[in-house]
């Protein structure tokens, strides 16, 4: 999705789909063009509707107004969703083993 944050940028919506119509705020992970190779990043690219390789950054999760989120760009693959789950575990320092997710 495109999201109004510090500027209009792509982001992954982390809030579950079923809750979206009922919430005034939505949690998102911004996508940055700079890929730093961190374990708290998930690589996305043209397959996901972007112009070039970028990184979903789970160290910068934000909650924004639902009105700030617009125009779906693309979808994550199953593998990227698993990587996203693991990046969340690492970013929030959760005590979960990889095989548990």
Feature map (PLM): residue ranges:
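Compact nucleic-acid interaction/catalytic patches
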Residues: 7-46
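C-terminal terminal-subdomain/extension
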Residues: 48-101
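Short coil-to-beta transition motif at edge beta-strands of beta-rich domains
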Residues: 1-3
């Amino acid at each position: 999705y495109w999201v109004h944050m510090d500027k209009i940028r792509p982001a992954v919506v982390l809030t579950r789909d079923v809750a979206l119509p009922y919430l005034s705020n939505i949690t998102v992970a911004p996508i940055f063009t700079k890929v730093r190779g961190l374990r708290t990043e998930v690589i996305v690219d043209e397959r996901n509707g972007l112009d070039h390789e970028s990184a979903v950054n789970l160290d910068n999760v934000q909650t924004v107004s639902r009105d700030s989120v617009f125009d779906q760009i693309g979808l994550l693959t199953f593998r990227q969703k698993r990587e996203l789950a693991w990046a969340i575990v690492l970013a929030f320092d959760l005590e979960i083993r990889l095989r548990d997710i």
